[in-house]
Structures are given as structure tokens and as C-alpha cells.
């Protein structure tokens, strides 16, 4: 087995101070996301989505963020997938963005709601044709007997709908409405900077900021 104990990096690129932090986490996230884009990181919109099933078993996977505003963080998927079933019984989730090149993480927790049909339709129409066909062809997370079966379904959907497949009823968007967002900046000697935004109706910005021990 490969020895792992000595694999480590001493983080030193930047700091995160309360005086420099935006008053609300959406503005802070926008700032960091723009910096990730400017740094030309590969797919900075990738995030880990963690859910819990009816049996209490957690699961996590990488998904793509497709929208962020003051209402929350939006992603799209198959409602009949494992994550879809998890969210149907436990509409709470956690997101994690990890931008290792900038030595940064963003951890987000909150409740899940479906986006409107109009939002889902609008995003679905913007997807490449192959992705729209794939949304029909794939029974996401279901067992299939072979790759050939999947490709046969893809061909059948393409022949049925041509260049204009509608959005499947089992496919659409979710919005995570956060109640806490943590920004993590790596620092030397593992004494990292961690600022936690928590919803607070009494605060002027609607959020309070706390520094967490690393």
C-alpha cells in the first residue's frame, strides 16, 4: 500500500479576515468564485453534494452549480436518481466547493426545495442536444445490463424527438437555501482561517459572522 502519512502541504497563499469579509455570504461567495474563474481553475463550478437516505446512510457525489443568488444555490438532476430519492425523504443537504489551487473551501448547509418548472425548462433548453437526449435515455442510478442498452435508448430518444426533446418530468432543478455558509482559507501550520456565516433575522445583513477555531 502507498504510504500516506507524509503527504501534506503547508498552505500560505492568502488570509481571511473579518474586516475584509463581505457582510453577507452570497457577496463573499461571488468574490471568491470570481477569483477562482480569474485563476482559470478547471471547472470551479464543481461541488460535492452530500445527502442522507431514508435508512440514514449518507452519500456524496460531484455535481455542477448552475445558479447562485440571494435565494440559494441551484443544481439540476434526475429526480429519480439516488440523490433525488434522498432529498425527497430528507430535504436537507450540504455542499462543498474545494479550490485547492487557491487553498480554499466553502461549506454550505441548508434545506432543499425544487426550482420552478419555468426555471427547469429554461435551463434544460440551454443544454447541448446530447445532454437533453441523455436526460431521457438514462434512468439515473438504476442497474442496466450493458452499455449497449443505454446507447439503444439514446438512439430511440433521438429518433423520437429529433432536435427538440422536451424536459422530462423526472428531471429538473433543486435549490439549496442555506442557513450556514463557512469560508475556509488554508494557513501555515494548520492554523487555518474559518469564517462562518449564520442566518440571523436580527442582523442588518440577515447574517452573523463568527470565527471558528481551525
Swiss-Prot record:
Matching SUPFAM superfamilies: FMN-binding split barrel
Keyword Ion transport on entry: no
Pfam families associated with the record: PNP_phzG_C, PNPOx_N
Keyword match Lipoprotein: no
GO BP of this protein: pyridoxine biosynthetic process
Entry keyword set: Flavoprotein, FMN, Oxidoreductase, Pyridoxine biosynthesis
Note accompanying the cofactor annotation: Binds 1 FMN per subunit.
EC number(s) reported in the record: 1.4.3.5
PROSITE patterns: PYRIDOX_OXIDASE (PS01064)
Positions of substrate binding: 8-11, 66, 123, 127, 131, 190-192
GO molecular function: FMN binding; pyridoxamine phosphate oxidase activity
Catalyzed reactions per annotation: pyridoxamine 5'-phosphate + O2 + H2O = pyridoxal 5'-phosphate + H2O2 + NH4(+); pyridoxine 5'-phosphate + O2 = pyridoxal 5'-phosphate + H2O2
NCBIfam families, alphabetized: pdxH, PRK05679.1
Described function: Catalyzes the oxidation of either pyridoxine 5'-phosphate (PNP) or pyridoxamine 5'-phosphate (PMP) into pyridoxal 5'-phosphate (PLP).
Identification of the protein by name: Pyridoxine/pyridoxamine 5'-phosphate oxidase
Organism: Burkholderia cenocepacia (strain HI2424)
Amino acid at each position: 500500500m502507498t504510504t500516506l502519512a507524509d503527504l501534506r502541504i503547508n498552505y500560505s497563499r492568502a488570509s481571511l479576515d473579518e474586516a475584509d469579509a463581505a457582510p453577507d455570504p452570497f457577496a463573499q461567495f461571488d468574490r471568491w468564485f470570481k477569483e477562482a474563474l480569474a485563476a482559470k481553475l478547471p471547472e470551479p463550478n464543481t461541488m460535492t453534494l452530500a445527502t442522507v437516505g431514508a435508512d440514514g446512510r449518507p452519500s456524496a457525489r460531484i455535481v455542477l452549480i448552475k445558479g447562485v443568488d440571494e435565494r440559494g444555490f441551484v443544481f439540476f438532476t434526475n429526480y429519480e436518481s439516488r440523490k433525488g430519492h434522498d432529498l425527497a425523504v430528507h430535504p436537507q443537504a450540504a455542499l462543498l466547493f474545494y479550490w485547492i489551487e487557491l487553498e480554499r473551501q466553502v461549506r454550505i448547509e441548508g434545506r432543499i426545495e425544487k426550482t420552478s418548472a419555468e426555471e427547469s425548462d429554461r435551463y434544460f433548453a440551454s443544454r447541448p442536444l446530447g445532454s437533453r437526449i441523455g436526460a431521457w435515455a438514462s434512468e439515473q442510478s438504476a442497474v442496466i445490463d450493458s452499455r449497449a442498452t443505454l446507447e439503444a435508448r439514446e438512439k430511440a430518444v433521438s429518433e423520437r424527438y429529433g432536435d427538440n426533446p422536451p424536459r422530462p418530468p423526472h428531471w429538473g432543478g433543486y435549490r439549496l437555501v442555506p442557513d450556514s455558509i463557512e469560508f475556509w482559507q488554508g494557513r501555515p501550520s494548520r492554523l487555518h482561517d474559518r469564517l462562518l456565516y449564520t442566518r440571523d433575522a436580527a442582523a442588518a445583513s440577515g447574517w452573523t459572522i463568527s470565527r471558528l477555531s481551525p
